[in-house]
Design a protein with these regions (language model features):
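Phosphate-binding site of ATP-dependent enzymes
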Residues: 2-76, 87-88, 92-94
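Glycine-rich phosphate/pyrophosphate-binding beta-alpha loops
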Residues: 47-58, 99-112
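Residues within well-ordered alpha helices
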Residues: 71-72, 108, 120
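Conserved metal-phosphate-binding beta-hairpin within the catalytic cores
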Residues: 75-108
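Glycine-centered helix-boundary capping/hinge motifs
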Residues: 76-77, 113, 125-126
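Peripheral (often C-terminal) accessory segments that flank ATP-dependent C-N-forming ligase machineries
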Residues: 89, 119-142
Length: 142
């Protein structure tokens, strides 16, 4: 009902739209780094987002890691870094998008102990400590 009002108000054509259902759950942005030998999967729980992630925490999450390994990496055979955005509702994973790039949470990944560009390329990643990020935005007026 609301979508039809939106379409009419903005004079849009339904065939030009991609509409997703709202899924209530926990949002994650997942860093994935892969080559022929290793897969590094680092879930980042997103608490606050406004275009970019503002508040997030690196978490170990076997449900997400297993889903990426058994579903996504079976069909997506890239050999580099990419980002998966998803919603986790209980044990069910809903993929929102897959991006062939680093996410805005990449600095958090490096700070948590994994740098894909270091000399220890694709060493086994061990999460040493849970680390949180809160992005502070400042405005200057002149």
């Amino acid at each position: 009902k609301d979508i039809n009002k939106f379409i009419a108000f903005y004079k849009l054509d339904k065939k030009d739209l991609l509409i997703q259902n709202f899924i209530k759950g926990n949002e994650y942005t997942v860093f994935v780094h892969t080559n022929k030998k290793n897969n590094i999967i680092i879930p980042v729980r997103v608490y606050q987002k406004k275009g970019v992630t503002i508040d997030a925490k690196v978490e170990k999450n076997k449900t997400i890691e297993n889903y990426i390994k058994t579903k996504i990496l079976k069909v997506l055979t890239t050999k580099n870094c990419f980002n998966v955005q998803l919603i986790l509702k209980g044990k069910k994973v809903y993929i929102i998008e897959i991006n062939p790039r680093l996410s805005t949470t990449f600095a958090l990944i490096v700070k948590s102990g994994y740098d894909p560009f270091s000399n220890s390329f694709l060493n086994k990643f061990i999460l040493k400590k849970k680390i949180k990020m809160h992005r502070y935005l400042t405005a200057k007026y002149y």
